[in-house]
């Protein structure tokens, strides 16, 4: 559905829109940082929407909101001005799922299989996850044909 939406939007506007590659997503999330989260070493439920009943590091337990929030609810943008890169909803990436990065493109291009692999990468974690699943480096996968209330997407505009 997400790839089809990007194709539709591209045809409608005459500009190329697509899902980000996994490498692009992580670059956008980190925004030049090297910490687990773009806002630092740890996370609290004051900074993102995740299952706050789980601890991360030395932080106390937080709130479990049980629903998605509107974009920008926490008003914690990264250095690129992007909101909600951690938690709220998993975000689809263009790449197919691979267990590791062996033989992955080293230039940021998408990594697609020639097989029937329809399992795609998701990044960012969601409201249902503990904080460790919301780190900049965390990754998950699902069949692209499946839909969930805790999965969304953000699109890339190609220049």
Regions found by a protein language model. Give the residues of each.
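Functional-site microenvironments in short loops/helix caps that host divalent-cation chemistry
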Residues: 1-138, 147
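Short, structured beta-strand segments at or near domain termini in extracellular proteins/domains
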Residues: 149-159
């Amino acid at each position: 559905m997400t790839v089809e939406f990007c194709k539709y939007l591209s045809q409608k506007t005459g500009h190329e829109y697509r899902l980000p590659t996994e490498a692009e997503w992580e670059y956008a999330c980190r925004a030049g940082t090297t910490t687990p989260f773009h806002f630092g070493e740890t996370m609290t439920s004051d900074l993102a929407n995740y299952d706050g009943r789980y601890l991360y590091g030395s932080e106390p337990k937080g709130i479990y909101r049980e629903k998605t929030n509107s974009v920008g609810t926490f008003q914690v943008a990264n250095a690129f001005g992007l909101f909600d890169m951690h938690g709220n909803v998993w975000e689809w990436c263009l790449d197919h799922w691979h267990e590791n990065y062996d033989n992955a493109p080293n230039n940021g291009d998408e990594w697609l299989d020639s097989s029937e692999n329809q399992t795609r990468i998701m990044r960012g974690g969601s409201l249902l996850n503990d904080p460790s699943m919301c780190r900049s480096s965390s990754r998950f996968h699902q069949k692209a044909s499946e839909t969930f209330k805790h999965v969304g997407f953000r699109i890339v505009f190609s220049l």
